[in-house]
Amino acid sequence: MKLRLDPSTQSNYHDVSISKLDWHARIDFDQELLHGKVSFVIQSARVSQALSHIILDTSYLEIKNVTINDIPTPFRVDKRRGFLGSALHIVPADEIPSSKSCILTILYSTTKDCTALQFLKPEQTIGGKFPYVFSECQAIHARSFIPCQDTPSVKVPCTFKIRSKLPVIASGIPCGTANFCNGSLEYLFEQKNPIPSYLFCILSGDLASTNIGPRSSVYTEPGNLLACKYEFEHDMENFMEAAEQLTLPYCWTRYDFVILPPSFPYGGMENPNATFATPTLIAGDRSNVNVIAHELAHSWSGNLVTNESWQCFWLNEGMTVFLERKILGRLYGEPTRQFEAIIGWGELEESVKLLGEDSEYTKLIQNLEGRDPDDAFSTVPYEKGSNFLYEIERVIGGPSVFEPFLPFYFRKFAKSTVNEVKFKHALYEYFSPLGLASKLDSIDWDTWYHAPGMPPVKPHFDTTLADPCYKLAESWTNSAKNSDDPSKFSSKDIENWSAGQKSLFLDVVYEAVSFPHNYIKRMGDVYSFAESKNAELSFRFFKLALKSKYKPLYNTIAERVGSVGRMKFVRPIFRLLNEADRAFAIETFEKYKHFYHKICASQVEKDLGLSE
């Protein structure tokens, strides 16, 4: 197989093998910096070839000192290459024989331009008394707070020793504290399983925790703890047991969940032993717990078995969505799995429409040469990938035939990486002895992998739970087209509906027409979408209002989008606000841009055409 390099790294990871990473860091809340020392156990990755040159990824780092086996070693930091950052070149005084390992140590500090870290002032937190910092490394931001081979192709076991005046969380099992000094402690963590750089995480702030299962705790600010406990304790262990039944025994010892401040840019981030999640999950009625199923599924798909590069991101996210819905199906019935897939298909259609049917970013296998992986981020790898697996399952003979492949797959590639070629080979390896190779042959692999746009096959989903949503949406749409009086609609229309059904209703009416303003007002009044604590509902309704240019809600929408950093909600709202009232959109962004994480702010700037 021809060697394929990850275009999103400048490191020479095919030449340099890293077997262990030991990271010491001190958090400086006053200067909003991190001072670090990272040590790698390295050796040549080439058989019988000495190691003479080491290249690591960095971005906005101040490199202070480099040693190899404690001997000072010259280094050079290249000029920045845009989103790729600045390559760090290290040339040992003497070549390192292929049979010998050594310890490479780098002393450094982050800078104000660090894209992985967000420091929060006390007033930006729930408690309002202490500062806070958290990281977000996916896709290629780890290089901005630690020099590394910043590619998912490289996975290493790690130890973390982090000094802070506030409690710390990192991507490993806590091993205690040590060395109290000047009001701060060292917090120790160990990650025995090899992990890629995008799963490195750090968080420090005013934290409290409580158990939400026999192997799970939730961490958050004290003022939010009881709400988080209620939201997750009912489902956590049930999800873990269902996931293990589908895959392999959980190998990470503990699955802990961290609810972050509202500026966190994603729904969740599957950091091992410390899943980071948005507070928008806290709806008060456990209606967003499917995100737990998704992040938990990453323990196998993504964390245990990792996409080789961001060009085949679907192998992380598509498989994870597929597992997430399998878990929900096991616990709540197959119609629930099918219903979630219907919502996902609608989100995929919206993404393809936004990106363009011929866009490179609508392919399963994407060419990211010269492209920032953050720009490629959409629901495509999630939903197109999941639907591809759904189609393979259908072709091969259904769940009873396909599901036994899952533990085989995760066992085969455990603690390693996978690409689309290896994935396909694994399918043939498993199903050919069962006489099912011809079934796999019937799949149009090239179209699924490389064609842009919607999938070549649309699944036939069970619409039992969706039909009432379609019926009510049709009634609203027809009434609006006929200019009927909307007073006939009442809260009883959606009585006993799940949050998912309400979401689907809003998705369908959003795609149908731009509603008259009296219809938007009536919908808001009788269904209380704008006031909903479930952000999935309120932001869907806000999209509908903006599409219909319903100005009475503009200020409410601006306030809400300025209090939530989750890009799933923020970016669509700003795009629609830009279409409805560009001046107001820019004014709103300028008002709140320092609230957002840099990843989010950067993407919104591009959406609004404000970036250089």
UniProtKB/Swiss-Prot annotation:
Pfam families: Leuk-A4-hydro_C, Peptidase_M1, Peptidase_M1_N. The keyword Transmembrane does not apply. It is found in: Cytoplasm; Nucleus. Its cofactor is Zn(2+). GO terms for biological process: cytoplasm to vacuole targeting by the NVT pathway; peptide catabolic process; protein catabolic process; proteolysis. Binds 1 zinc ion per subunit. The keyword Zinc applies. Its EC number is 3.4.11.-, 3.3.2.10. One of its GO terms (cellular component) is NVT complex. The active site is at residues 295, 382. Keywords: Cytoplasm, Hydrolase, Metal-binding, Metalloprotease, Nucleus, Protease, Zinc. Substrate binds at residues 136-138, 265-270. Zn(2+) binds at residues 294, 298, 317. Aminopeptidase that preferentially cleaves di- and tripeptides. Also has low epoxide hydrolase activity (in vitro). Can hydrolyze the epoxide leukotriene LTA(4) but it forms preferentially 5,6-dihydroxy-7,9,11,14-eicosatetraenoic acid rather than the cytokine leukotriene B(4) as the product compared to the homologous mammalian enzyme (in vitro). Belongs to the peptidase M1 family. This is Leucine aminopeptidase 2. It comes from Schizosaccharomyces pombe (strain 972 / ATCC 24843) (Fission yeast).
